Amino acid sequence: MSFQGTSSGSSHSSKSKLNQVVQNFFSKATQVVVQARLNPRLREQRQSGDKHKLNKWFNLETDELEAYREDLKLWRTIDIYNMDKMPPVVVETYLDMRHLSPNQTLVLEDAFGKRWNASFGGRKTEVVLERWVIEIQRPDPQAGGATTSPASSTELPMAYKKCILLFRSLYTYCRLLPAWTLQKRLSKSKLSTSPLRIGCRVLNGSQPISSRGRVGLSKLIAGSSESQHLQTFSFDPVEIPSGVFKISVSYRVNCNFAVDDSEAMLSSQFLRIDEEKPVVPPSPPVKHPSMAAPNLHYITGLPRRHSHSQGVGVSGAAIVPTSVSSVTDYMERRRSSGASGVGATGGGLAGTSGGSGGVSGGVSGGSGGSGGSGGWGGEEGSPGPAATSASPSTPPFARVPSSSSLAALRIPRRTISNSSTSSTNNARVVTTPGYTPSAYEQAISSSGGSSRSGSVPKYSSSFGTRQWNRSGSISSTRRRNSMLVGSAESAMSSGSSLMEPGSGFIDIEDPTDVSDFVKMVDSIKPGSPYSLPSPRKGSDPLARFQQLKGSHAGIADSITSSIYHHQPSPPYVRSKLSGEANLEAISSLPRPVTVPPSPRKLETQMQPISLADQHTSEYHQLQQRTSARPQAHSYSERDQLDNSHYKALERYDLVGASPSVVGSRYYTEHDRGRGEKRYSVAPLPGLEFDEDDDLLFAMSDMAMGDSASGGNVRT
């Protein structure tokens, strides 16, 4: 009996010790977590009314908080042998937002420095930071596990020692989590109390946990992924005779909460919305063949399809609108429309004996079948030789690579703009169906389309739109002629180029004098000295005019002396030599003789050929106006002066002399029959000018006289 009583007493003490270990296990674990999260000042206030007690279980001294004693009443009075399943203890750590003012907002700053609203418009009052779960898992008898048996004297002490290691790990790990950092940051604000507070709540794990009015642990606040904002950690379990001790925690990784102004938070949200808008990547540039093709054609000479969407000119070129004032605008319109420049009907209008199958036929004048049908306006007929001989990779009537378009770009805009209007007016009527060109238009098309399209004139009236090579003029002409007749590719290139001279786009008419000048220059060899045909054979113009110098000086002196000697009556002097004989009264006082104007200024005022008729009419008008004036001198003096002047003037060759001398002679001859004394000649403005001007002016007069009379000069 004594043995049975001893064994029953030992088993009862073993059960009581096991129950104490289990009860203190739940209470000690809860106290360690709560004391690590609560503010020390708040913890002191809660302990102020109670006697300070220390909890030394599991070799860890902690404060005994009586505030959570009622919450842990179930687990403090538990009997492990009488309960089949023990509920777990859940300790939640949360952030309390109830003390925030209306103009304050809880924000969460992420790792990139962005702030996110965590109050959700004031509808939430708490944010769950951590959730601790403390439990004992007992073996299930239905699953074949061992039933609860009294702990032996050797098993319980070993389990207690393992629990000491577990609580030390729990105490350390609680101070490594983000919630501990938040609690230390909030407790450092000594000057002002933060409206944010961290609280803990003890819950029964066997009952459902509601998240109404608070932000749950699984709720995503920041703009990070769900797998990053929440993590879970479990401690190593400790086995006891009646089951297994387990502690686990789930916590938020980012607990960088702060209080911010509501208006500032609102503006930051707007900025964040703008930053989070998906940026549409720029679409790759769309290449338009119609815009890129013309540049390649002019640079590399690639094949280019022709179109008959625009009219065809008389010489085979496309009609240029009259409103286009520059080549650049015209080419831009050509690129936008995608049309080329040459039509198939240019061959028939260029003076050929039939329809042309291609551009080569239209330019060189070869006869062929009807116009080609591929890309040439849809005319019926078989394609010409140029179309049939093209390679399969090259489109019909493709442009042959050449440098004609590059050279055409160098043509000044003024030449093209001036000639484009006339070329357009002549070529516009050709596009009308059933129109029969007139003889004048056929002549223009025959000369401009067939001849000028192949051979480029070397000179023009402006002398600024063509390049002139004196040494290679004959060879270049032969080379162009051979390219025009013998090479179909050169004919196609010259006929299809819109900018090339002679294509109809530029209408050039060479004057006769320019062509004569070109012939004269071509006849001179590069090494030969420049010489002009002499006005008279065997005479030197320089020596001739040097001999006239003394006679001119003598005539000037005689006229000047006659004016000084005969001054009693006011003379009447002609104001101009251009045909108007206005008489002006001059003072009777003697005045010095002024220097006459230069002959170069008198060139535009008097023409020697028509002075006879003009002076005849002037003489009669002067005779009628001055018939009533008194005679101051005798007729003998007047006749003597006129005879001396006339004899002096007859000694000179007046054909090559200055126009002023010729005018003086005509005036003197018509004045000889007058019966009164009149000083009709002022100092002759051709006798006292510079010798160099006289020489140059006389040479030009001689050249004009020789060309008119064929070299027969009157002496």
UniProtKB/Swiss-Prot annotation:
Any one GO molecular-function label of the UniProt entry: protein kinase regulator activity
The protein, known as: Autophagy-related protein 13
Membership in a protein family: Belongs to the ATG13 family. Fungi subfamily.
InterPro entries on file: ATG13, Atg13_N, HORMA_dom_sf
Keywords: Autophagy, Cytoplasm, Protein transport, Transport
Function: Activates the ATG1 kinase in a nutritional condition dependent manner through the TOR pathway, leading to autophagy. Also involved in cytoplasm to vacuole transport (Cvt) and more specifically in Cvt vesicle formation. Seems to play a role in the switching machinery regulating the conversion between the Cvt pathway and autophagy. Finally, ATG13 is also required for glycogen storage during stationary phase.
Chain intervals for the UniProt region annotation (Disordered): 329-510
A GO BP annotation: protein localization to phagophore assembly site
Biased composition range(s): Polar residues: 458-476
Keyword Protein transport in annotation: yes
Domain of life, per lineage: Eukaryota
Pfam families: ATG13
Gene Ontology cellular component annotations, sorted alphabetically: Atg1/ULK1 kinase complex; autophagosome; cytosol; phagophore assembly site
